[in-house]
């Protein structure tokens, strides 16, 4: 990733986080923009979001984000239009790293428990 795309991705991550926090306050699961990856031509930005909640809440939140993508992009455009000629298309993807880490911790705990019981 070039220096420019890194700067753009960082700015988009900050702005998307602020938009989701201020413009779309929800009483549901905790939602965090973890990372934004942007194509070299700055035409597409993939925002990876971490959603802490149960399976149903995560599915509803992803559906909400996908339904609101155009509105979120419009709000984003109004905030950063003076910095870019063209605002990238947005795509939201769920970042499952937190869930995977929790599962690994759970497995490690069970292994420790079993090895402690067998000794």
UniProtKB/Swiss-Prot annotation:
Entry's Gene Ontology BP terms: maturation of SSU-rRNA
Keywords: Cytoplasm, Ribosome biogenesis
A GO molecular function held by the record: ribosomal small subunit binding
Entry GO CC: cytosol
Subcellular localization: Cytoplasm
Gene3D superfamilies reported in the protein's UniProt record: 3.30.300.20
Chief location bin: cytoplasm
Function: One of several proteins that assist in the late maturation steps of the functional core of the 30S ribosomal subunit. Associates with free 30S ribosomal subunits (but not with 30S subunits that are part of 70S ribosomes or polysomes). Required for efficient processing of 16S rRNA. May interact with the 5'-terminal helix region of 16S rRNA.
Similarity comment text for this entry: Belongs to the RbfA family.
Subunit (UniProt): Monomer. Binds 30S ribosomal subunits, but not 50S ribosomal subunits or 70S ribosomes.
Name of the protein described by the UniProt record: Ribosome-binding factor A
Species of provenance: Chlorobium phaeovibrioides (strain DSM 265 / 1930) (Prosthecochloris vibrioformis (strain DSM 265))
Lineage: Bacteria, Pseudomonadati, Chlorobiota, Chlorobiia, Chlorobiales
Name of the gene: rbfA
């Amino acid at each position: 990733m070039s220096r420019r795309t890194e700067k753009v991705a960082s700015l988009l991550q900050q702005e998307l986080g602020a938009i989701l926090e201020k413009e779309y306050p929800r009483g549901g699961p905790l939602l965090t923009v973890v990372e934004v990856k942007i194509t070299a031509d700055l035409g597409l930005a993939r925002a990876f979001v971490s959603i802490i909640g149960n399976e149903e809440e995560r599915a509803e939140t992803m559906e909400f984000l996908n339904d609101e993508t155009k509105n979120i992009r419009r709000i984003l455009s109004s905030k950063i239009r003076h910095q870019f000629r063209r605002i990238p298309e947005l795509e939201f993807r769920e970042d499952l790293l937190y869930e995977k880490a929790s599962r690994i911790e759970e497995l490690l705990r069970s292994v420790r428990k079993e090895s402690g019981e067998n000794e």
